[in-house]
């Protein structure tokens, strides 16, 4: 899996620290063909999503498994999203810099209906077909879960499956 080259864009955005892996306690496991590669997606900016307890729990559980790797991705601010589109650079995991489209599974946290449009924006930036009927076996499985997923119908044409209840128990 090749890393996305995006560093040249950082000087052009308001808060570049949103897009680099500069956190304490991150696992730093590298996605590979020998394990299931998860990208945990939070459809809001880094400053909102990094403190979300549910993502932290799933991230820790998955990375403690021998045969799994979990990375994270957050919705970019419009300045960075625009540059990604202009430069034809796909949205990527914050730790590995691997394109989201190269992961096996992308799991979106559905905290509020207000972030549903951000999910579609993130799929577009990741160069993943929006409609589940347009995706094939080379595309990641798109999962959703969280409080706003209690009624999955509004997003059912975009997701492959939903987890109802606590993700760590699924």
Can you annotate each of these PLM segments?
Residues 1-16, 65:
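Helix-enriched interaction subdomains in cytosolic or periplasmic regions
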Residues 75-170:
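Glycine-rich beta-alpha loop elements in corrinoid/cobalamin-binding modules
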Residues 33-35, 139:
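Sequence-level motif detector for i,i+2 pairs with an aromatic at +2
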Residues 2-8, 46, 123, 140-142:
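N-proximal accessory regions
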Residues 23-33, 96-98:
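Short boundary motifs at domain starts and secondary-structure transition points
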Residues 2, 22-27, 60:
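ER/secretory pathway lumenal C-terminal domains and tails of membrane proteins involved
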Residues 45-48, 113-115:
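Short acidic, S/G/P-rich loop/turn micro-motifs used as interaction or catalytic elements
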Residues 38-43, 49-60, 64-84, 88, ...:
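Low-complexity, highly charged intrinsically disordered N-terminal segments
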């Amino acid at each position: 899996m090749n890393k996305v080259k995006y560093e040249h864009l950082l000087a052009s955005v308001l808060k570049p620290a949103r897009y680099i892996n500069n956190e304490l306690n991150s696992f730093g496991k590298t996605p590979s063909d020998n394990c299931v590669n998860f990208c945990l997606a939070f459809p809001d900016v880094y400053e909102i999503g990094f403190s979300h307890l549910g993502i932290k729990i799933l991230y820790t559980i998955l990375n403690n498994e021998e045969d799994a790797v979990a990375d994270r991705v957050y919705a970019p601010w419009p300045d960075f999203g625009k540059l990604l589109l202009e430069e034809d650079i796909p949205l990527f995991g914050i730790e590995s810099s691997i394109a989201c489209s190269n992961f096996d599974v992308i799991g979106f946290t559905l905290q509020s209906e207000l972030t549903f449009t951000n999910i579609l924006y993130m799929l577009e930036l990741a160069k993943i077909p929006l409609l589940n009927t347009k995706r094939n076996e080379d595309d990641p499985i798109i999962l959703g879960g969280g409080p706003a997923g209690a009624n999955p119908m509004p997003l059912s044409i975009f997701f492959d499956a939903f987890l109802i209840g606590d993700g760590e128990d699924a």
